[in-house]
């Protein structure tokens, strides 16, 4: 999307947010290049703003990386971590994710921690094991106070871009 398209989408989400129950939090996560203009749109509204990732370093010469203080500084309250695409294509490990989660929390951001299994893991009956390991390896390193600031997002990897969707029962498992 272009920045203009991102801004228009943010305006539409803000307008629609009036119809959302008070106990539901709407959060949008545009690309990094759209964060500032979208932050201006959602500022002062009930709509939260998230980055799609963060660096695993606070400062330093890491060309192309975006540190948590930069993300918080632009107005984000959240950061998506552990997305299946980051795990698969960028080799993000549990150790990397522990570091990112802790950096995000230290910067005042709430991590949106993604968990989910691949199709072959579900078909082999290993989905509980896989998701449990993802949670245990990263989130069990946190204190109860830190954990209270984390949003866990279940996203079955086998449903991404395949046209297949998880049933309500599968999501509730």
Across the structure, where does each feature detected by a protein language model lie?
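Active-site loop-to-helix "anion-binding N-cap" substructures in soluble metabolic enzymes
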Residues: 1-173
């Amino acid at each position: 999307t272009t920045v203009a398209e991102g801004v228009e989408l943010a305006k539409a989400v803000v307008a629609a947010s009036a119809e959302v129950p008070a106990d539901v939090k709407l959060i949008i996560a545009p690309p990094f290049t759209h964060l500032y203009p979208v932050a201006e749109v959602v500022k002062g509204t009930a709509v939260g703003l998230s980055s799609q990732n963060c660096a695993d370093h606070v400062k330093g010469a890491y060309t192309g990386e975006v540190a948590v203080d930069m993300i918080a500084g632009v107005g984000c309250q959240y950061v998506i971590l552990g997305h299946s695409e980051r795990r698969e294509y960028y080799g993000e490990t549990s150790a990397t994710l522990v570091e990112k989660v802790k950096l995000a929390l230290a910067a005042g951001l709430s991590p949106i921690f993604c968990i989910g299994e691949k199709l072959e893991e579900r078909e082999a009956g290993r989905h509980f094991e896989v998701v449990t390991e993802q949670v245990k390896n990263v989130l069990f390193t946190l204190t109860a106070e830190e954990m209270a600031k984390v949003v866990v997002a279940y996203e079955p990897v086998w449903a991404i871009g395949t046209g297949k969707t998880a049933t309500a029962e599968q999501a509730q498992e």
